Amino acid sequence: SYNAYRILPTNLISAGDFIRVNDRTDAPTVADMGDIRVASFNVLNFFNDVVGGDANPSGSNRGALIEEEMVLQRTKIVNALVAMNADVVGLMEIANNGFGELSAIQNLVDALNAELTDDQAYRFVEIEDADKYEDKFIGSDAITVGMLYRPARITLDGAAKVIATPEQHAAEGAQTREKDGVVEQNPSYDKFQRHSLVQTFSINDEKLTIVVNHLKSKGSGCIEDWAEFNENGEPADLQGKCNSFRVSAAKVLGESLKDVEGDVLVIGDLNAYGKEDPVAVLTDYDASTTDHVIRTASWTTLNGKVYEREGSVIDKGYGLINLNTQAHGADTYSYSYNGELGNLDHALANESLAAKLVGIDDWHINSVESNLFEYGSKYTGELVKTESPFSASDHDPVIIALSYPAPVTPVTPTPEPVKDSDGGSLGYFALMLLGALGLRRRS
């Protein structure tokens, strides 16, 4: 063996030795339910740089590095979207390279519409020029959120809007911490999260406002993690790093949406599980009923101005309803991390929209699949990949079916004219004549 180690298996397995507990499905259970369907889908860094796509603000490519992989990634995403059959789709992790012919979102829509009939075709929502960063982008990150819709099924109501999310900027030495008598000053912190995209639609004279979100990840730390000596470890509450920063974003979202008229649906990758602070702030948190204190982040700015220097305590949530919890309880998931399943991708609604829920489904095409079957080949060698929706991303899409029945126009019945008798029965006038004749004979 020339001093090389080899593996000598002592037992062989076959396909029949595996126990399957999550059977694949060709489409979500709600794909044909309701009057309108909305989906949320994290598309795992869909970039089109390798086919001449426009640059994003950071100039970096987080997606496919060769054209073959990019085409495979796009094909898997398209096949998933076709099967979802949603009328509106919120996207996360799509390249933030504008809305032109060489943008990632145009590239995706072109490929998607090539598989559909005209009445099923999609367009993307574009923000107004005044809201674009550097006249082109949604915020300054390499990735962004996006929204697709079917104009044959749903109508735009006004222009799209951007909800800017907080940033955290703490200069070096702005804060101190102490442990075992040693006092330290913080390094500088500059943290960002994706802006949210808002679009109102008109459906049968009703308004539906959809908000697509992608909050700060749990991976990189914020100054609160440094202050608690967690910059290199897991925070004690197990909610991941930058939790207070995500709470700040949830507060901004809640404040921005609390007075919106009509139905409201908040979707996207919140990078927070269903019982964690950011979701609690958007839904049913009440400080008077618990000892758990929820705080926003410190050193935050919003639209370039100081937002919260010290952070603040949240007293009450914004009252949105977790549709997955309403329909299925806590037994839902859309993501797998270190073998543990949980729900990072949410659909939160106000009361009027929650009453319209027909069905909701996390379509498990990614979370329980091996990431070896994703588009990338860096670590998979000659492993055969397929164009199926399975392993199209690392997050499961969530699909929401809603009831928006078309109004029924009342029909006023047309009175039928009285028909002349042609035998078998006597009309009213004939009876009157007979009565008159009878009276005359008696006289």
PLM features: residue spans?
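Divalent cation-coordinating acidic motifs and surrounding scaffolds
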Residues: R6-V408
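Ser/Thr/Gly/Pro-rich low-complexity, disordered linker/stalk segments of secreted
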Residues: P407-S421
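Juxtamembrane/start-of-transmembrane alpha-helix segments at the extracytoplasmic/lumenal side
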Residues: K419-F429
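A cross-kingdom C-terminal cell-surface attachment/processing module
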Residues: G427-S443
